[in-house]
Amino acid sequence: MADLQGKAVLTIAVPEAKADQIEAEILRLRAATTEAGSVQLEQFDRLEQVFLAPSSYDVIFSGHIALPAKSHADSALAKLAAALKPGGRLALRESLNSRNETALRSALTMGGFVNVQVSTSEHALEAHADKPVYEVGAAAPLKLSFAKKKQSGAAAPAAQVAEVWTIATDDFDDDDLLENDGDELLDAEDLALATTAPEGDDCEVGAGGKRRACKNCTCGRADAEAEQAAKPTLTGPLPASSCGNCYLGDAFRCASCPYLGMPAFKPGEKVTLSDRQLKADA
């Protein structure tokens, strides 16, 4: 890798990485970036849930602590690309049984990376890729000239184009249009629907005075009630520690850890967090 002095670095560890391995890698990166740079840690299995500020890192390492990472999902690669600064670099390692070089190269290219280099080592599939020097959706000025060009010769006469969409005004009689009755434009089926359609308040009144759809509802209330009943209820377990190293101190905590900034504590010790600490920084 290039010189990391003064760079903002993010390293992503796999769940199998031990505390001493994480600490050694963090110390190595901090020595390389010096005080002018910064080093942050995240966990691979929480990559989809954590917030990574856009265009914040010069270099991102993934799968370089202990074992290589599993296959990076397309959404994860897109998230890492957005977190890199323009011209930033991604260096990742995947297990050999995750996919082949061609598939990884294609995934990185589709994720928005350029200068993709993929190789196979003895223990892992390694890749280096760069983010373009521009942001997606960035605006750039275009040099446009609207000056009239000088004509070399006499202007040719305009071609006579046939007017195919003209209507002669004498084809219609305004009096005939005004005398037409609107009901004459409806057939028997249209009139039957107009007379049998229920009013907006023609629904039955159920318990509690709330209107409900009729058995043969045609006003749309039955569809609205069915759609409301089909809405899913979001349930799921509360987020838990992924790395299990939160109690060791900031050197072992992820950048999005709610315990960040607090002193180390004993395993199993009760620690109370405020509502502000439980909310992720936007």
UniProtKB/Swiss-Prot annotation:
Pfam families xref list: Anamorsin_N, CIAPIN1
Chain ranges passing through the membrane: none
Disulfide pattern: none
Binding-site positions, [4Fe-4S] cluster: 243, 246, 254, 257
Region (Fe-S binding site A), start-end ranges: 203-219
GO CC entries: cytoplasm; mitochondrial intermembrane space
HAMAP family: Anamorsin
Protein name per the record: Anamorsin homolog
Organism: Monosiga brevicollis
